[in-house]
A protein has these predicted regions:
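Glycine-rich phosphate/diphosphate-binding loop of Rossmann-like nucleotide-binding domains
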Residues: 52-64, 148-227
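Positively charged, low-complexity intrinsically disordered leader regions
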Residues: 1-60, 64
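Short, structured coil segments at secondary-structure junctions
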Residues: 69, 99, 119-121, 176, ...
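Rossmann-like adenosine-cofactor binding region
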Residues: 200-279
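Phosphate/diphosphate ligand-binding glycine-rich loop within oxidoreductases
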Residues: 36-145, 273
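Phosphate-coordination loops involved in phosphoryl transfer and adenosine-cofactor binding
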Residues: 42-47, 152-154, 262
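Adenosine-phosphate binding glycine-rich loop
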Residues: 262-263, 269-310
């Protein structure tokens, strides 16, 4: 079993063993980093990072992660690249592959990332598309593992928009045997193909998937409560209509009471306080949102090292 040379586009493509291989390695790299022990596994290697959307956590965690691994990272804004002026993705893939050892991309269309990966001869990492956010979901479930000690049989409840975040959470929960209940307004349900993919994985792992439109019912006995913005990047024009549609799809104190007493509250960030989550809950004792943000660094370092190291 080796991830070397592979792409990282979706958790759906990973085996359960590969997920735990990444988690185990992330734990080791996190300990080394905390102890100040050098771990230059990617010495002399370069990561090209293409961004067609804004980012704080993803950009900084990948860039700092490459430095900590002894390599370097290039921030490539699509506004400044020829890809932003219409150069084909397949040409960009082959050109960059002649310069760098790995490509990370954040963009709109998931198909574009698949095309990039098809033509690139170096590993491609999906750092968010409209469909998926696999690096975030890996960091989140690694965080849940740290807090809960085990994943199988635990329940994650996602409240809000059926977006890239819940799609990747469905993939990973189904793989690792966590139950997942999702509450979205009826018109904003998760992608049907993704739900089917998760259902297949859930059969193997014993995980239970429930898709509802009632937040309180979904939150019953949850070990993890998760939410994300009502309007993702690219949907800013729908903000007003979404505010109406999502009223009530909020992690607040009432919802917290429905979950287990020791539930942990997660959000991939950036958060909109007063919309999908209240100030008191995100700042309260159940919230682990900054642990999740930190773990982006450690989990992505593990992914990059496993994909790109000699
Ligand atoms: N969670 C996340 O991906 O954050 P950024 O958009 O800041 O990268
Ligand atoms: N669903 C959000 C996640 C941001 C990290 C978005 O796509 O904008």
């Amino acid at each position: 079993m080796s991830l070397k040379g592979k792409d990282f586009l979706s958790v759906h493509h990973l085996t359960v063993d590969e997920i735990y291989q990444i988690f185990d390695f992330a734990r080791i790299l996190k300990a080394k980093q905390k102890a100040g022990e050098p771990h230059p596994l990617l010495k002399g290697k370069t990561l090209g990072m293409i961004f067609q959307k804004a980012s704080t956590r993803t950009r900084v965690s990948f860039e700092v992660g490459m430095w900590q691994l002894g390599g370097s990272a290039l921030f490539l804004s699509s506004n400044d690249m020829q890809i932003g002026r219409g150069e084909p993705v397949k040409d960009t893939a082959r050109v960059l592959s002649r310069y760098v050892d790995g490509i990370m991309i954040r963009t709109f269309s998931h198909l574009e990332v698949e095309e990039l990966a098809e033509y690139a001869t170096v590993p491609v990492i999906n750092a968010l598309t409209d469909l998926l956010h696999p690096c975030q979901a890996m960091a989140d479930i690694f965080t849940a593992l740290e807090h809960k000690g085990e994943l199988k049989g635990r329940k994650l409840c996602y409240i809000g928009d059926g977006n890239n975040m819940v799609n990747s959470l469905l993939h990973i929960c189904a793989k690792v045997g966590m139950d997942i209940s999702v509450a979205t307004p009826a018109n904003y349900a998760p992608d049907a193909t993704i739900v089917e993919q998760a259902a297949v994985a859930a059969k193997l792992s014993g995980s239970k998937i429930t898709i509802l439109d009632d937040p309180l019912a979904a939150a019953q006995d949850a070990d993890v409560l998760y939410t994300d913005v009502w309007a993702s990047m690219g949907k800013e024009g729908e903000q007003a209509i979404r505010k109406q549609a999502f009223a009530g799809f909020q992690i607040n104190n009432t919802l917290l009471q429905a979950a287990k007493k020791d539930t942990i509250v997660m959000h991939c960030l950036p958060a909109h306080r007063g919309e999908e989550i209240t100030e008191d809950v995100i700042e309260g004792p159940n919230s682990v949102v900054f642990d999740e943000a930190e773990n982006r660094l450690h989990v992505q370092k593990a992914i990059m090292a496993l994909l790109m190291a000699d």
